[in-house]
């Protein structure tokens, strides 16, 4: 698996202060999702990695829905910075 450097969306100071914040957790999940997606492009039949990807996607989706309920402005900023599509409301 080739690791590619990602542009830091959150500054280094914010990383040190807010490791438990929703934004930081979503950023970490997004990095993992990108890494696993690139792995799955090479290894299409790696079903264990597919399962892990689905679990991480679900965790990120739950965090994003929590953030959208609590603070819509922070949610909009985060999805714009990370280039994530806005989830469909049911």
From Swiss-Prot:
Q: Which cysteines are joined by disulfide bonds?
A: none
> Which SUPFAM superfamilies does the entry mention?
S15/NS1 RNA-binding domain
What PROSITE patterns does this protein's entry cite? RIBOSOMAL_S15
The answer on whether this UniProt entry bears the keyword Metal-binding reads no
Q: Which GO terms describe its cellular component?
A: chloroplast; ribonucleoprotein complex; ribosome
InterPro entries, per the entry: Ribosomal_uS15, Ribosomal_uS15_bac-type, uS15_NS1_RNA-bd_sf
Q: Which GO terms describe its molecular function?
A: structural constituent of ribosome
Q: Which domain of life is it from?
A: Eukaryota
* Compartments, as annotated in UniProt: Plastid, Chloroplast
Family the entry assigns: Belongs to the universal ribosomal protein uS15 family.
Q: How does it assemble?
A: Part of the 30S ribosomal subunit.
**Protein name, UniProt field:** Small ribosomal subunit protein uS15c
Source organism (scientific name): Pelargonium hortorum
- Tell me the classification of the organism that encodes this protein: Eukaryota, Viridiplantae, Streptophyta, Embryophyta, Tracheophyta
């Amino acid at each position: 698996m080739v690791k590619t450097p990602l542009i830091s969306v959150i500054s280094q100071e914010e990383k040190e202060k807010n490791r438990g914040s929703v934004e930081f957790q979503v950023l970490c999940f997004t990095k993992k999702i990108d890494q696993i997606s690139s792995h799955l492009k090479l290894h299409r039949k790696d079903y264990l990695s597919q399962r892990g990807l689905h679990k991480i996607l679900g965790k990120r989706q739950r965090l994003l829905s929590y953030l959208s309920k609590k603070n819509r402005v922070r949610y909009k900023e985060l999805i714009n910075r990370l280039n994530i599509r806005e989830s469909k409301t049911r």
